[in-house]
Amino acid sequence: MAGAKEIRSKIASVQNTQKITKAMEMVAASKMRKSQERMAASRPYAETMRKVIGHLALGNLEYKHPYLDERDVKRVGYLVVSTDRGLCGGLNINLFKRLLAEMKGWSEKGVETDLALIGSKAASFFGSVGGNVVAQVTGMGDNPSLSELIGPVKVMLQAYDEGRLDKLYIVSNKFINTMSQEPQIVQLLPLPPAEDGELKKKSWDYLYEPDPKVLLDTLLRRYVESQVYQGVVENLASEQAARMVAMKAATDNGGSLIKELQLVYNKARQASITQELTEIVSGASAV
């Protein structure tokens, strides 16, 4: 059994770690509230944009935009949204596992994949496991802006425009609630039609002013940008929630470990006192 002094040292070490994890839990909770507000503020715009685009995909358009056309799939692209920091449980690895399974399915069909990475964890992961990374951006912090995301988005849209990509997806974590975050892979291009059964029964016609080509070119790029930005802010809210839960679990585990060490310490101290008493009694008997 370890000595009492050594056990006291372990208890002090765990207590120090517990203070750190508790502080990180509180910081994550504060950041989560802010990121939830940012997510809630942008979600109506992203959802409305998705609905309008769904109508367009079902509409009788004067100008058929290339983003509406299905192609024979030879290469697909993924915009992968991850975190810049760790200590957020299995948030990133669960997302990467989902993506790898998807990529394996395409590979079995002879389809190649390109990756545009957002966040240092994705860059580190695919730097280790391999993958055709064509763009990446890291270090966006807790308040990402659309201007920081333009680089990877522009690279993937250009590849799609030039016919080098036949499908484009965004891979991110969807914020369900504080305890639940769900990895999701959402198709961006070609535009998926509206999923609502009632909408599919309707025929959507639009009048364009001044020119349908200019209007649709702008609208469809805004659509992609809005979905990517929404994916990033939802992933950020998921990150802070996952970190808060992970740090709370670490703090609770630290408390349990301290109780166990305290019990071991008491036993060690009791054994030491018993040993001393035995030695005193033995010495007195010898005299």
UniProtKB/Swiss-Prot annotation:
A GO BP entry: proton motive force-driven plasma membrane ATP synthesis
Keyword Membrane tagged: yes
One function term, GO molecular function aspect: proton-transporting ATP synthase activity, rotational mechanism
Main location: membrane
Cellular component, GO annotation: plasma membrane; proton-transporting ATP synthase complex
Keywords (A to Z) from UniProt: ATP synthesis, Cell inner membrane, Cell membrane, CF(1), Hydrogen ion transport, Ion transport, Membrane, Transport
Mitochondrion keyword on record: no
Gene3D superfamilies, alphabetized: 3.40.1380.10, ATP synthase, gamma subunit, helix hairpin domain
Recorded topology in the membrane: Peripheral membrane protein
Cross-referenced PROSITE patterns: ATPASE_GAMMA
Function text: Produces ATP from ADP in the presence of a proton gradient across the membrane. The gamma chain is believed to be important in regulating ATPase activity and the flow of protons through the CF(0) complex.
Family the entry assigns: Belongs to the ATPase gamma chain family.
PANTHER family: ATP SYNTHASE GAMMA CHAIN, ATP SYNTHASE SUBUNIT GAMMA, MITOCHONDRIAL
The name this protein goes by in its record: ATP synthase gamma chain
Gene responsible for this protein: atpG
